[in-house]
Design a protein with these regions (language model features):
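Short cysteine-rich clusters marking metal-coordination/redox-active sites
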Residues: 40-45, 101-104
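Short cysteine/histidine-rich metal-coordination sites, predominantly Zn2+-binding motifs
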Residues: 57-69, 117-133
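Short, non-ligating residues that shape and space the ligands of small metal-coordination modules
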Residues: 48-52, 107-117
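Short, flexible, mixed-charge glycine/proline-rich loop motifs
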Residues: 25-39, 89-95
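N-terminal "domain-start" segment
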Residues: 1-34
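Cysteine-rich micro-motifs
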Residues: 64-70, 98-107
Length: 136
């Protein structure tokens, strides 16, 4: 039996999590009457027509400055030793997925990444948030 993920509020001590103006909460929209399907909303315009591009997986031991970064994209993938400066987690593993939106951007929308969906571990908690990107 498939169970739907339940979104329940969980109180975190935000003083322990580094935040800045480049981060946004993740919003989802329920699709019709299906209790198991939800769409991500664009962090820029709020629409649901998002497409993912590159996926980056960061793997490192706790608090290590260097780790492995695996990048998967349309043309292929590669793994390399990384200083993990783009890792959304300050302490452990992290995942970053680049998204573009059909409604945002100039010219070809697929050339304009609207945000990075980040999954981060911090002191026993797994967080999910949008991170802004510079398209210049």
């Amino acid at each position: 039996m498939i169970k739907s993920a339940t979104l329940r509020p969980h109180v975190l001590n935000l003083k322990n999590i580094p935040m800045d103006e480049l981060l946004k909460p993740v919003e989802i929209e329920r699709v019709g009457d299906d209790p198991y399907w939800h769409d991500l909303c664009c962090p820029s315009c709020g629409e649901i027509f998002l497409h993912h591009r590159a996926v980056r997986v960061f793997n490192r031991d706790q608090d290590e400055e260097i780790g492995l970064e695996t990048v998967v994209f349309e043309e292929g993938s590669h793994t390399h030793v990384s200083p993990c400066c783009d890792n959304p987690s300050l302490r452990r593993h992290g995942v970053v997925i680049d998204f573009y939106c059909e409604h945002c951007g100039e010219g070809r929308p697929e050339d304009h990444v609207v945000g990075q969906l980040c999954i981060s571990q911090h002191k026993g908690h797994t967080g999910i948030f949008w991170r802004a990107v510079d398209n210049q």
